[in-house]
Every structure is written in structure tokens, then in C-alpha cells.
């Protein structure tokens, strides 16, 4: 199984790159994790936000591998405690399909992305900055992996 993070935004601060890359490198070779960045639509005073969301959504879905399980990151999604995320990761592995996790831009995800998702994951009821979400997702998935393999990273 391969994990794929598809996220809107291409110019992240150095701390985001450093944090995300740190966790990315920790994943084992049998569970590759990749990041695909989708350019954010140009937002301005007179921007058509609905159209921008639609375009971003089209690009995100086009980046998802055929047959991949799509999981959106969205506030109204399911909140998993760490042990539950580890169980979810195991179920995804047993399913045998690659998993694409979608992070939208400032206005969130398009309705098409939400409709295409098999699952929706909420990190928090708080609105989080999208760059931070990349690091949180990578760390959370690495921690879940560490639980499933009895790696000492996670401590109760």
C-alpha cells in the first residue's frame, strides 16, 4: 500500500517542508508516502471562489491514482484517536489499495472531492492552517504505523 497526500498549495514555509520531510523519511520502504502539491487558484477581491474550488478539486482528483481509496481531511469528518487511526491504517493495508488523503485550500475541498471520498477524517474541530495539517497528518500516520509494528516511537 502506498500513501499519497494530495494538498492544495505549493510554496510552503521552510518549517513545513522540514517537519513533513522528517516524517516522510521515517516511513518504511513497504509503505511509501508521497506528497503531490496542487497549485492554489489565484484568490483576490473579485475571485470566483466557487470556480477556484471546482478547478482545485478537478486537479486533486486527477492526481489520485486509479482505484485509490480517497480520504478527505475535513472538520466534519470522523475523529480518530491514535489507536483507532492505527486500526484504520491496518484495515487500509489489508484492503490492498493505495490511499489518497486530500487536503483542500483556504476554503476547503470542492463538493466533488467530498463526494468522491470513501472516508473523511477530522484532525480537530478547530480550523487549522493547511500547511500545519500536512505535518500533523504525516506525524499521525507515522505514529499509527509505529503502533501497528510495535515500534518504540509511540508511548502510552
Curated annotation (Swiss-Prot):
It is found in: Cytoplasm. S-adenosyl-L-methionine binds at residues 73, 104, 123-128. It catalyses: pseudouridine(1915) in 23S rRNA + S-adenosyl-L-methionine = N(3)-methylpseudouridine(1915) in 23S rRNA + S-adenosyl-L-homocysteine + H(+). Its EC number is 2.1.1.177. It comes from the Bacteria. The keyword Methyltransferase applies. Its main location: cytoplasm. GO terms for cellular component: cytoplasm. GO terms for molecular function: rRNA (pseudouridine-N3-)-methyltransferase activity. Pfam families: SPOUT_MTase. Keywords: Cytoplasm, Methyltransferase, rRNA processing, S-adenosyl-L-methionine, Transferase. InterPro entries: Alpha/beta_knot_MTases, RlmH-like, tRNA_m1G_MTases_N. It is an enzyme of class 2 (transferase). Specifically methylates the pseudouridine at position 1915 (m3Psi1915) in 23S rRNA. NCBIfam families: PRK00103.1-1, PRK00103.1-4, tRNA_RlmH_YbeA. Belongs to the RNA methyltransferase RlmH family. Homodimer. This is Ribosomal RNA large subunit methyltransferase H.
Amino acid at each position: 500500500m502506498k500513501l499519497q497526500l494530495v494538498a492544495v498549495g505549493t510554496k510552503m514555509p521552510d518549517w513545513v517542508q522540514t517537519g513533513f520531510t522528517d516524517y516522510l523519511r521515517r516511513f518504511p520502504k513497504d509503505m511509501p508516502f508521497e506528497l503531490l502539491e496542487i497549485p492554489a487558484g489565484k484568490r483576490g477581491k473579485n475571485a470566483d471562489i466557487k470556480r477556484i474550488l471546482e478547478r482545485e478539486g478537478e486537479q486533486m482528483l486527477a492526481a489520485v491514482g486509479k482505484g485509490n481509496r480517497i480520504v478527505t481531511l475535513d472538520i466534519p469528518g470522523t475523529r480518530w484517536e491514535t489507536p483507532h487511526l492505527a486500526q484504520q491504517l491496518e484495515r487500509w493495508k489489508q484492503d490492498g489499495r493505495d490511499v489518497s488523503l486530500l487536503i483542500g485550500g483556504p476554503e476547503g475541498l470542492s463538493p466533488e472531492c467530498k463526494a468522491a471520498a470513501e472516508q473523511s477524517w477530522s484532525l480537530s474541530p478547530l480550523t487549522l492552517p493547511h500547511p500545519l495539517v500536512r505535518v500533523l497528518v504525516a506525524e499521525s500516520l507515522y505514529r499509527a504505523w509505529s503502533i501497528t509494528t510495535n515500534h518504540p516511537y509511540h508511548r502510552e
